[in-house]
């Protein structure tokens, strides 16, 4: 989820800051990269440290010092298939917004909720129908979700890569309709979201959704095991089966 990368970039120091060079370099780096995506690396989170600087140059007509700085920064870029936890910030019929605390622009398309899920107009919340129960996705509740796709917003950052060719002729009517709905939702999302990084996420698989659902279930299973009184202590235990652009370098 978080990566430490090394970057070389040019920084200008104003004449009035010559006596405070290190702090000025840190301020200029944070000013340039905060809320920005480092292309092919991820969303800037924090400056980690400064490794060194090159020689300073003063250009004609500019009294400031220009120098190359080598530094490390922490970036956020989850990988496809990674499971994260966040908090529901806002819900609507169109989407569920999730926050990680430092990053709030995660939007869940309702078709990626557990099936079947419906929207309660009075509550303004989505819920999952399970065994005739309505399990709500409550605002402020902690949720677990899987990363399906990471995109850069073309309105703010570099255009997202073009999708691979999809053979829609081989799809049945339901799959084709679902595919088209996703395409429309994705296009609308890119127009509305003012974030340089967009995460497409889902909660369809077991173990995803509200964390409280699975926590309560685990607690219930533990109670049942205690009531058994260790009747199966002699059973064999199964073995485990084993998821001037700056120069960028990703650290090991």
Curated annotation (Swiss-Prot):
Any one GO CC term of this protein is: RNA polymerase III complex
From the Swiss-Prot or TrEMBL record, state where the protein is found. Nucleus
Fetch the InterPro entries from UniProt: NA-bd_OB-fold, RNA_pol_III_Rbc25, RNA_pol_Rpb7-like_N_sf, Rpb7-like, Rpb7-like_N
One biological process term from GO is: transcription initiation at RNA polymerase III promoter
Annotated coiled-coil positions are none
Q: Which Gene3D superfamilies match?
A: Nucleic acid-binding proteins (2.40.50.140), RNA polymerase Rpb7-like, N-terminal domain (3.30.1490.120)
Question: For the region Disordered, what residue ranges are annotated?
Answer: 214-252
Asked if Nucleus is a keyword of the record, the answer is yes
Q: Entry's Pfam families?
A: RNA_pol_Rbc25, SHS2_Rpb7-N
Compositionally skewed regions (Acidic residues) per UniProt: 220-252
Please give the Gene Ontology molecular function terms for this protein: DNA-directed RNA polymerase activity
UniProt superkingdom: Eukaryota
Query: Which family is it part of?
Result: Belongs to the eukaryotic RPB7/RPC8 RNA polymerase subunit family.
Instruction: Describe the function of this protein.
Output: DNA-dependent RNA polymerase catalyzes the transcription of DNA into RNA using the four ribonucleoside triphosphates as substrates.
Instruction: Report what the protein is called.
Output: DNA-directed RNA polymerase III subunit rpc8
């Amino acid at each position: 989820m978080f990566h430490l990368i090394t970057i070389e970039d040019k920084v200008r120091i104003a004449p009035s800051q010559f006596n405070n060079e290190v702090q000025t370099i840190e301020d200029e780096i944070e000013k340039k990269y905060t809320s920005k995506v480092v292309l092919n690396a991820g969303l800037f989170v924090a400056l980690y440290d400064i490794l060194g600087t090159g020689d300073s140059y003063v250009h004609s007509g500019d009294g400031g010092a220009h120098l190359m700085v080598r530094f490390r920064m922490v970036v956020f870029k989850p990988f496809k298939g990674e499971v994260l936890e966040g908090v529901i910030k806002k819900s609507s019929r169109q989407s569920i917004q999730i926050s990680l605390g430092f990053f709030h622009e995660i939007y869940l398309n309702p078709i990626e909720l557990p099936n079947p899920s419906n929207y309660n107009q009075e509550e303004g919340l989505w819920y999952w129908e399970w065994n005739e129960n309505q399990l709500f996705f409550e605002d402020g509740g902690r949720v677990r979700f899987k990363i399906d796709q990471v995109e850069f917003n073309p309105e703010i950052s570099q255009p997202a890569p073009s999708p691979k060719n999809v053979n829609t002729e081989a799809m049945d009517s339901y799959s084709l309709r679902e595919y088209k709905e996703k395409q429309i939702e994705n296009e609308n999302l890119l127009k509305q979201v003012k974030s340089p990084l967009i995460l497409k996420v889902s909660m369809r698989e077991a173990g995803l959704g509200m964390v409280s659902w699975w926590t309560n279930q685990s607690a219930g299973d533990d109670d049942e095991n205690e009531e058994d009184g260790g009747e199966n202590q002699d059973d064999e235990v199964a073995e485990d089966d084993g998821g001037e652009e700056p120069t960028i370098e990703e650290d090991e």
